[in-house]
Structure formats: structure tokens, C-alpha cells
Curated annotation (Swiss-Prot):
Residues 102-131 form a coiled coil. Residues 24-74, 129-149 are annotated as: Disordered. This is Uncharacterized protein AF_1465. It comes from Archaeoglobus fulgidus (strain ATCC 49558 / DSM 4304 / JCM 9628 / NBRC 100126 / VC-16). Keywords: Coiled coil. Residues 28-42 have a biased composition (Basic and acidic residues).
């Protein structure tokens, strides 16, 4: 009995191999397609048309990276609005007090209407104070530079 099972398995394997190899039931011979010849020459790049100079990589933007120092008013507004929005989102997820969120919303309006860097610095100080009151640690928040008397 085991010899019959082995014979049966062998027949199935051979018929499968015949089908996979491309033989047809009419007895036609199927020849495999010839492979294209590979050019084995090594090509050297032309130094006149190629250069080793590549374009500089832009800096990677990561939400956990520190906020760059504020140099211009519009950039400062955008950075501060982004920080305020992220803080509001975090507080809403955690179910924080609504008075803190409303203070932050009013700060957003102040940021939008700020006309000088000095106003923006004052708003940043208010933002830090609100964060401290809410118990939000923010080590990535840049401190403003000391002011000359």
C-alpha cells in the first residue's frame, strides 16, 4: 500500500512539473525564449557631464524639535500660534479646565494682532505664565533674550 501512495505522489509531481515547464497536451515542443545578451562592459561616468555636487538637504522637520528662535514678526507669530494650538489640543484631549483654554484662545487673538516684536515677547511671557498655572512643563519653549536697560 505505501508503494502505491508513493507512485501516486510521483505521478502528480511529474505531471505538475510538465505543466510548469510549458509542455502542451498536443505534444508540441515549447522552446524557452532566449535571454537577451548582457553587455558586461563597465561604463565610467564622463567627468565633464557629471558632478559630485549635490543639492543641500533641507532640515528635517520634527514636531519634538525645539522651536527656532524668533527673528521676524511673521515667523514669530506663526511659531507662537503653533505652540498655542498644540497646547490647546493637548488640554482638550486631557479634559483640562475650560478657563485655561479660553485664556489661550484670547492669546491667539493677541498674537494675530501683534504689530511689534516687543508685543510678541509680552504675549510669549503670558503664554509661559498660563502654562505654569496649568502645570504644563515645556522645556522646548525658547526664553527671550535679556533686554538692554
Amino acid at each position: 500500500m505505501p508503494a502505491r501512495k508513493l507512485t501516486f505522489i510521483l505521478i502528480i509531481m511529474l505531471s505538475g512539473a510538465a505543466i510548469l515547464s510549458g509542455c502542451t497536451s498536443q505534444g508540441e515542443d515549447v522552446k524557452p525564449e532566449p535571454k537577451p545578451e548582457v553587455d558586461e562592459k563597465v561604463t565610467v561616468p564622463n567627468p565633464e557631464t557629471t558632478s559630485n555636487i549635490s543639492a543641500p538637504m533641507p532640515p528635517l522637520k520634527n514636531s519634538t524639535s525645539p522651536v527656532p528662535p524668533v527673528n521676524d514678526l511673521e515667523g514669530g507669530k506663526e511659531a507662537l500660534l503653533d505652540m498655542i494650538n498644540r497646547t490647546i489640543d493637548m488640554l482638550e484631549r486631557e479634559g483640562a479646565r475650560s478657563d485655561i483654554i479660553s485664556e489661550l484662545e484670547s492669546l491667539k487673538e493677541k498674537v494675530s494682532s501683534a504689530t511689534s516684536m516687543e508685543e510678541l515677547r509680552e504675549i510669549m511671557e503670558e503664554f509661559r505664565a498660563i502654562q505654569d498655572d496649568a502645570g504644563i512643563p515645556n522645556p522646548e519653549m525658547p526664553k527671550s533674550a535679556p533686554r538692554a536697560p
